[in-house]
Amino acid sequence: MALRELKVCLLGDTGVGKSSIVWRFVEDSFDPNINPTIGASFMTKTVQYQNELHKFLIWDTAGQEAFRALAPMYYRGSAAAIIVYDITKEETFSTLKNWVKELRQHGPPNIVVAIAGNKCDLIDVREVMERDAKDYADSIHAIFVETSAKNAININELFIEISRRIPSADANPPSGGKGFKLRRQPSEPQRSCC
């Protein structure tokens, strides 16, 4: 079975639950007292998808303003980006649109984008309507899912959908030696003035 490494980065404001999503996916655990990420953290998880193994190389980026300039370093070369907002904080959804804009301008051209509305277990204090977020995700051709890292809602489904959207390895086969070969130019004899 073929193994594919897929770099995935998580973007979004501080406190939206990016680290909790990663911990729930990789370790199947939830820590209500998790500390904010400083810079970025890295974890991996391998899952089977159809006839391939997908090894997710997950970069969880810091959401604080001071670390925003580092984000391009993490999403460069990514197969997918998960942009997370908190359904209980409208401003995190507004900021999400800036992340999408930056990703479209500076990220890989074929990156798979997923929008994750986290903390869907807090439905009574919702500020971002699911329909509005879904409509926005559809308008930018992104995956949309509401998640709860706390209650393990739609976390695995999010990564399965990313696997589904990433072109299969068969769609981009290696060139099979049909590239070109670099050769040295024959050097001309050295001329001397003496």
UniProtKB/Swiss-Prot annotation:
Top-rank taxon, per record: Eukaryota
Effect upon mutating Q64L: Impairs normal protein trafficking through early endosomes
InterPro entries: P-loop_NTPase, Small_GTP-bd, Small_GTPase
Biological processes per GO annotation: endocytosis; intracellular protein transport
Cellular component, GO, one term: endosome membrane
Subcellular location, record wording: Endosome membrane; Cell membrane; Early endosome; Late endosome
Motif Effector region, residue numbers: 34-42
SMART domains: RAB, RAN, RAS, RHO
Region of interest (Disordered), ranges: 170-194
Membrane topology category: Lipid-anchor
CDD domains on file: Rab5_related
Lipid linkage positions (S-geranylgeranyl cysteine): C193, C194
Pfam families: Ras
GO molecular function, one term: GDP binding
Sites where the protein binds GTP: 12-20, 60-64, 118-121, 148-150
Keyword terms of this UniProt record: Cell membrane, Cell projection, Cytoplasmic vesicle, Endocytosis, Endosome, GTP-binding, Lipoprotein, Membrane, Nucleotide-binding, Prenylation, Protein transport, Transport
Gene3D superfamilies xref list: P-loop containing nucleotide triphosphate hydrolases
Assembly mode: Interacts directly with ZFYVE20. Interacts (in its GTP-bound form) with RINL and RABGEF1. Binds EEA1.
Known role: Plays a role in endocytosis and intracellular protein transport. Mediates trafficking of TF from early endosomes to recycling endosomes. Required for NGF-mediated endocytosis of NTRK1, and subsequent neurite outgrowth. Binds GTP and GDP and has low GTPase activity. Alternates between a GTP-bound active form and a GDP-bound inactive form.
Family indicated by similarity: Belongs to the small GTPase superfamily. Rab family.
Protein name as catalogued: Ras-related protein Rab-22A
Lineage: Eukaryota, Metazoa, Chordata, Craniata, Vertebrata
Name of the encoding gene: RAB22A
